[in-house]
Every structure is written in C-alpha cells, then in structure tokens.
Design a protein with these regions (language model features):
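Residues that flank catalytic or metal-binding motifs in active/ligand-binding sites
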Residues: 2, 15, 102-106, 187, ...
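Feature responds to low-complexity, polar/acidic, surface-exposed segments characteristic
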Residues: 369-393, 401-511, 515-536, 541
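Short, composition-biased local secondary-structure segments
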Residues: 4-10, 307, 443-446, 525-526
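A short, hydrophobic/aromatic-rich structural module that often spans a beta strand
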Residues: 11-12, 466
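Flavin (FAD/FMN)-binding glycine-rich loop and adjacent Rossmann-like elements that form
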Residues: 2-6, 13, 18, 22-23, ...
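Conserved beta-strand edge residues that scaffold enzyme active sites
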Residues: 6-7, 65, 409, 488
Length: 541
C-alpha cells in the first residue's frame, strides 16, 4: 500500500512467501506493522531491500573494466566540459577502471516556478543548515523549460546532485534513511536558496501547486540506482552498445527479450566536488560521469535479468541483474514500467501454470506481452495497431528480419546519438515490397529451418552477401524436394546461376517457398501475383 515500506520477508526454504511492512509518513516516521503473503512477490522498489532480507545475492557500486565493459570502474570524461587537447566525448587520464562500492549522485526531483517578481511567498527567508554557496552554480538568464512557468531543477546543471551518500542510503535501514533524507533535503534547498540570492533569480521558488501537504517539496528522494540482483542473466554494457556486439545501430539481438530500452548510458558524477572549479581529472575533479548517447542504440532486456539465480517466488523488475554501466541506461521510468509489466505477466503465468518463475517459458511471456502491445524490438514505423505488429516482433526475436547495412547510411563525421532514431535503419518498412534476399532470411529463420549450405551456387549472392546462407539453404531444400520450390536463373551450361536477391517477391512465390519448406500447402494471399509487402510477408510466415 502507499506509504508503507518493507522491513522484512517471510521465507520457506529458498522461497519468498510474503513481506512484512511498516507504515511510513512523509517525515519518515514509522508506524503500524502489516503482513502480506503471496504466491509471487514483486519488489519494484529502487532499493530492492527484499534482496537483503531474503539473502539474495546482489551487486552494489561499480564493477571493474572488462572486455564487455570498457567504461566500467573509475573513469574521468569531458562530456560536460571542454578539456584542452581532447576531442569531445573522451576518456581522460587516471581512468583506472577499478571497481568500487560507490553509486552515482542522488537528489530530489525538484520543480521550481518563476513567479515573475521577487516578493512571492515561496522565497526562502534563510539558508538551510550547512549551506555552502561554493557548491552551486546558476545562470540568471535561465528560463522555464516546462509548462506553467516552471523549471526542472533536476535537469539544470545537475544542481541538486550530491555524491557520497548513495550507497549508504541503499544499505541503510529506514531509521537511518531519515537522517540521509535530511542531508539531501538541505542540499537541494541550498540550491534553491543560491538561485534566489547569489544566482540572481529571486523570482524563482518552490511551486505553489505541488506537494502542498509537504511544504511544496517532493516526498521521495530520487534513487538513481540501488541494489542489482544476481540473476539468471546479467545485462552488461556490451548488451546496450551499438558497436561492441551490435550492428552499428542497435545492441545485439537478445531473443529472450521482455522489454526494451532506448536511452544513452548516462551516469551523473560518482565522486568529486559540487559545482566548484575543478581540474579535468585526478584529485579535485568530478569522476564517474558518463554520457554514451552516441554509442548506445536501442537494446533489449531478457527475462532472466528479473529472476534471482537460486531463490523462488520473487521478481525484481527495477533492481534487475545488471552492471552499473548497464543500469545507467536502464534506470529510466519507461524501461522500469515495461519491466514491471513483464514481471506481472510472468507472475500470472507462473501461478496459472503452477511453475517456478525461472521455469515459465519465455515465449509464453512474450506472447502475452505482444497481445498487450508491448514492444520487444524497437522500430520507428511499426505502430502498435499495425496488422503486422505481432508477426514482425516475433520474427525479429528469431533473427528473421534482415538488418540494415551500415555502409548504406551516412554516419561518417556525425554523432547520431538519440537523434538517429529517425534514421531509416530503425524502420521495418512494412509497406515496401520484400525482396528475395530479405524473404529468404524471413522464411528460414522465421520457420526455424536448419541451415544447409552445400556450395556457393549464385554469382549474385556470393559468400559475404547478407542473404548468402539463406538463399543457399532455400536452394538445398528445394533440390531435395520432389517438387522444386526455389526459382533461379541458371547459365546455359548450368555451371553458374543467378538468384536475383533484389527482385521483388509475389504472394504466389512466397506461398510456394513456404509450402516447400513446410511440406504442406500454404495458401497464397488474395492477390497472388501482386508484389508482397514486408508486412504481408511477415504475417504470411
């Protein structure tokens, strides 16, 4: 229930069977206790306290640099400042990559309002305890960026960020967290006081129409990352990165996906000063900042990240099994919402099937998520109401959709970043005609036909061609069939041939190929001689 916090769990062996809670008001005062039991427990909190109570292994802090994680550990960058002699987005000296226990800065999600005059009633009359103006900076020319004359102070210069207490918060009990909340509360009020005084903007104050029962101040601290369980699958930087294992546009295909992310690897500072002038790296410099928007592409999150390795009856859709670097992107509310949806579906299926959570078939979870129009692989031009939506999503998870060729896109000299989401590379193009090369991959991988390659038969589909192994597989199965189903153009002496991978495919041709592969009649579309679109082909397969 709202305004209750978990303080312990009920266990039966390695199974979590219930949760013990206490009421907690907005001032942190703990009240009456409550007890809940359930067939499945879902811990969707930032802190993932239930992992601690249930002795479920978890990670906290930062992992060391590795092959899968070149940006892990202690790191200095110039993402938000210029460094003489360094190009933008550069990893700087003294970036040791050493692991530690630290977390990125926490804060409150403060909204402020421009009242247009300095004598408004929400101007702070005195600074909070411990106020130090050297911690802050503010440009008085800053203007409201959200409706109703309001500022998102969370996103302006990271002014409310405070390092050094994140890990302590996560590991603390609820009594100690009250004291930590005060530290952040005073720090963030100090930022607002600075804005109103030395910042030269006395017209700015807390909003009169928000958090009216809490002094117009947010109820909860913003925990950017908490515990991360040890799950059946651990998401790493290489699962998000476009280039480490991806195709230059998106992360690698993860067939067990139950959610997607589309946000850069973004970490606020982990160590360093608060707003003071500082050297670019080393002692006295801010450390831990990451902003890998150019290197991060749309990516997938497997079901195994929600499921503890050795415990039953509980899922973690927020404190998922991942590294610090991966969490720097996953930590967005739309992603956690999708993971929460997946957790709910998995829990319901486990109960209905009378199965352990780790034994629920991922395909069942995916099928239900697709019925609910959840996206499991990202496209810019495949709306949820598209007739081809479910088919394309399923086929994409099987690797049946031909990916883009990076050579076909002008990426040289440009930092595409999140703006690249408008590129053709992220489009499925459901209304465009499908080619034979594309259809060969759609059919072979979509029907999960084992590859069979006897030789390189076609001069226009040589080894190295994107469709090579799929065209050759169609040829091999066709020649073994009593009735050949793959058409090609042989030379007069039958020593070479053309497969025409760029030729459009008709509905009749597609049905003929599918019938041959499945060894049963597949009806052709209503207009068999018309060119088949990519969306129609997906539905047919």
């Amino acid at each position: 229930r709202f305004n209750e916090v978990a303080v312990d769990v009920k266990m039966k062996g390695q199974r979590v069977t219930g949760v013990l809670t206490r009421e907690r008001d907005n001032q942190g005062k703990l009240g009456p206790r409550h007890s809940y039991t359930g067939k499945v427990i879902i811990d969707a909190t930032y802190e993932a306290d239930l992992a601690e109570y249930a002795d479920i292994p978890y990670r906290i802090g930062r992992e060391a640099r590795s092959k899968e994680e070149p940006h892990a550990g202690v790191i200095y960058t110039n993402y938000f400042r210029r460094v003489k002699g360094a190009l933008p987005s550069t990893v700087l000296p003294e970036s040791t990559g050493v692991a530690d226990h630290r977390s990125q800065a926490f804060t409150y999600r403060i909204t402020a309002k421009d009242y247009g005059r300095p004598d408004h009633p929400y101007r702070l009359k005195k600074p909070p305890p411990g106020y130090d103006p050297a911690k802050y900076s503010w440009n008085p020319r800053t203007r409201p960026i959200i409706p109703n004359g309001k500022f998102d102070l969370l996103g302006i210069n990271w002014g409310g960020d405070l390092v050094g207490h994140g890990t302590r918060w996560v590991l603390a009990d609820w009594e100690e967290r009250v004291e930590i909340e005060k530290i952040y509360h005073y720090h963030d009020l100090g930022y607002l006081y600075y804005i109103q005084t030395k910042g030269g903007s006395p017209n700015v104050g807390l909003p009169d129409d928000e958090f009216q029962d809490n002094g117009n101040f947010p109820y909860r601290i913003y925990v950017r990352q908490g515990r991360r369980i040890e799950g059946l699958y651990t998401l790493t930087e290489s699962d998000l990165h476009k280039d480490l294992r991806g195709d230059g546009f998106r992360g690698p295909l993860l067939p067990d996906s139950v959610a997607i992310g589309i946000y850069g690897i973004d970490a606020h500072r982990v160590q360093g000063p608060d707003g003071r002038k500082e050297p670019p790296y080393g002692k006295g410099a801010a450390e831990g900042t990451l902003h890998l928007h150019d290197a991060t592409g749309p990516y997938q999150i497997p079901y195994g990240t929600l499921v503890p390795k050795d415990h039953n009856g509980i899922l973690f859709p927020v404190g998922i099994s991942c590294t610090h670097v991966a969490m720097c992107s996953v930590r967005m509310e739309p992603v956690w919402s999708s993971l929460g949806q997946a957790a709910g579906v998995a829990a319901a299926l486990a109960i209905d099937n009378e199965q352990e959570l780790k034994d629920v078939p991922v395909k069942q979870i995916q099928d239900e998520l697709l019925k609910q129009r959840s996206v499991l692989l990202f496209y810019t031009d495949l709306p949820l109401d598209s007739p081809a939506f479910t088919a394309v999503q399923k086929l994409s998870l099987l690797g049946a959709v031909a990916g883009p060729d990076i050579d076909d896109y002008d990426t040289a000299g440009k930092s595409k970043g999140l703006g690249s989401l408008e590129m053709k590379a992220y489009r499925f193009r459901p209304n465009e005609p499908i080619t034979m090369g594309e259809f060969s991959q759609l059919a072979v991988n979509g029907l999960q036909i084992p590859l069979s390659i006897t030789a390189s038969h076609f001069t226009d589909v040589p080894r190295g061609h994107a469709a090579f192994k799929y065209v050759e597989t169609l040829y091999d199965y066709s020649t073994q069939s009593k009735q050949a189903f793959f058409d090609f153009e042989p030379s007069k002496d039958f020593r070479t041939a053309l497969a025409h991978p760029d030729k459009k495919v008709s509905g009749a041709q597609a049905a003929k190929i599918l019938s041959g592969l499945l060894k049963k009649k597949v009806p052709a579309p209503a207009q068999p001689d018309a060119d088949l679109t990519r969306g129609e082909a997906a539905q047919l397969v």
